[in-house]
């Protein structure tokens, strides 16, 4: 049996029944990483010794018949912008090359408390800015379904690790679609929770009012398992909500009778690949056949979401990335004349093109002459988009759409076409702007590549997402597909 192909809940059952040891599972994944990651590029750092040490500790507990925790013995990969004590945290940027984290992010602490085995740090677009993981300063991540195609981004390494069987579970971050879009491209399940459901403490900030940590897994149950483990109030992050975290496993029922689902016409317009549309429409029919009430709806302000997002996120990035100055840690230019020159050259040489593009855009829209015309107006548009979603959720329990307008595109295909790259997030960005939760799960294959179905719900209604996603998943077999790599 190939342990790397199994889900987290399958591995949990085997561990509980003493059919396998945690060390055996961990070594199987480390062997898999050593075998395939030179081609897939999911990992930027592998913590082999520490992972085996933790696995042995869990095996001792199992032998003593101690109660297992939620993630005991389950291999997890962590995106390289989420701090793990003693491991590198580079954000896939030259400017942080060699930086080792002195502390754990809140979500990392929670995984350790639940005895998950952290295998290492995962590849990403630099500072989480990108939709293909081609902006990593260190290596290219490739889609396990087709090595000539991108895995999506910015959490490309997180999706590749799960789809390529290099981790059972992974954590990514989602600012405008960076968990959902790579989940769609790689055929795994990825959740962007409600803003404030999961702590951002210890996560390197890109857009502080948009960033969210999101779990990825091979199926909906795995995703629910990891969400339950890491969600909840954190006093170090004042944006986290003081709301009880439900046991999301209880949401995993096949009963969706009477659930009201809206189909927004704006998500099915020009630019949507006809075969992706067909797969999503077939998925909607399955939900309807299973008892959901499906009706059309409209989100007329969606067309403004992408523009508002890039203004707001770039403005926040300009502020957040000002701390990387070449003085305190990270990359420092070797050729400089004075202190001002250190800042200028260290940042110019340390940041990649996409990061510099967004810093410049953000600085521009925050400047005295343009603040009202761009940034302030974008905030007003954001409020209207939130109101739009709230209006729809008074009538519907959830909204269903494609996750991305296409399947995974070829490496290099959009690298120099900035607008085309940005448009790959056109269906995920509005959800981030509104701050509501959404899940992506596989709903078909087009020319050997996965298609993602996006289900969106109201604030803190992740249980509705898991319920609908699980119902659909159990009616089809797409979650059982494994990339033959």
UniProtKB/Swiss-Prot annotation:
The active site is at 79 (charge relay system), 154 (charge relay system), 178 (acyl-ester intermediate). Keywords: ATP-binding, Ligase, Nucleotide-binding, Protein biosynthesis. PROSITE patterns: AMIDASES. The keyword rRNA processing does not apply. Coiled coil: none annotated. GO terms for molecular function: ATP binding; glutaminyl-tRNA synthase (glutamine-hydrolyzing) activity. Its EC number is 6.3.5.7. It holds the Pfam family Amidase. The keyword Cytoplasm does not apply. PANTHER family: GLUTAMYL-TRNA(GLN) AMIDOTRANSFERASE SUBUNIT A, TRANSAMIDASE. Heterotrimer of A, B and C subunits. Belongs to the amidase family. GatA subfamily. This is Glutamyl-tRNA(Gln) amidotransferase subunit A. It comes from Clostridium botulinum (strain Langeland / NCTC 10281 / Type F).
């Amino acid at each position: 049996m190939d342990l790397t192909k199994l889900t987290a809940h399958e591995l949990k059952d085997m561990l509980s029944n003493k059919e396998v040891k945690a060390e055996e599972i961990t070594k199987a994944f480390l062997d898999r990483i050593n075998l395939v990651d030179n081609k897939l590029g999911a990992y930027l750092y592998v913590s082999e010794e520490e992972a085996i040490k933790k696995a042995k500790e869990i095996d001792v507990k199992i032998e003593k018949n101690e109660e297992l925790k939620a993630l005991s013995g389950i291999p997890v990969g962590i995106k390289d912008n989420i701090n793990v004590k003693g491991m590198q945290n580079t954000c896939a940027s030259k400017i942080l090359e060699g930086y080792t984290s002195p502390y754990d992010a809140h979500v990392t602490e929670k995984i350790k408390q639940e005895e998950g085995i952290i295998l290492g740090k995962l590849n990403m677009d630099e500072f989480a800015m990108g939709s293909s993981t081609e902006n990593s300063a260190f290596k290219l991540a490739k889609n396990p379904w087709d090595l000539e195609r991108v895995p999506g981004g910015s959490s490309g390494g997180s999706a590749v690790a799960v789809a390529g069987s290099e981790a059972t579970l992974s954590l990514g971050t989602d600012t405008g679609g960076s968990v959902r879009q790579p989940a769609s491209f790689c055929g795994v399940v990825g959740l962007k929770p409600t803003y404030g459901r999961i702590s951002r403490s210890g996560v390197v900030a890109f857009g502080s009012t948009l960033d969210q940590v999101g779990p990825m897994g091979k199926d909906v149950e795995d995703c629910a398992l990891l969400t339950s483990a890491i969600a909840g109030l954190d006093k170090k992050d004042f944006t986290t909500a003081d709301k009880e975290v439900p046991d999301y496993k209880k949401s995993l029922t096949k009963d969706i009778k009477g659930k009201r689902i809206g189909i927004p016409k704006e998500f099915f317009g020009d630019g949507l690949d006809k075969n992706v549309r067909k797969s999503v429409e077939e998925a909607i029919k399955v939900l309807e056949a299973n008892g959901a009430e499906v009706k059309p709806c409209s989100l007329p302000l969606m067309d403004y979401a992408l523009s508002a997002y890039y203004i707001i996120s770039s403005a926040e990035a300009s502020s957040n990335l000002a701390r990387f100055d070449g003085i305190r840690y990270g990359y420092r230019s070797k050729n400089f004349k004075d202190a001002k020159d250190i800042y200028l050259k260290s940042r110019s040489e340390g940041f990649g093109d996409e990061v510099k593009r967004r810093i410049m855009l953000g600085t521009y829209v925050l400047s005295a002459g343009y603040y009202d015309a761009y940034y302030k107006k974008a905030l007003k548009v954001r409020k209207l988009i939130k109101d739009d979603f709230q209006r729809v959720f008074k009538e519907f329990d959830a909204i269903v759409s494609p996750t991305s307008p296409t399947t995974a595109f070829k490496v290099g295909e959009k690298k120099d076409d900035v607008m085309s790259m940005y448009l790959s997030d056109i269906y995920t960005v509005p959800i981030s702007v509104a701050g509501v939760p959404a899940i992506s799960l596989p709903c078909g294959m087009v020319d050997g590549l996965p298609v993602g179905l996006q289900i969106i719900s109201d604030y803190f209604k992740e249980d509705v997402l898991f319920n609908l996603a699980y119902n659909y998943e159990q009616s089809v077999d797409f979650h059982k597909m494994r990339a033959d790599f």
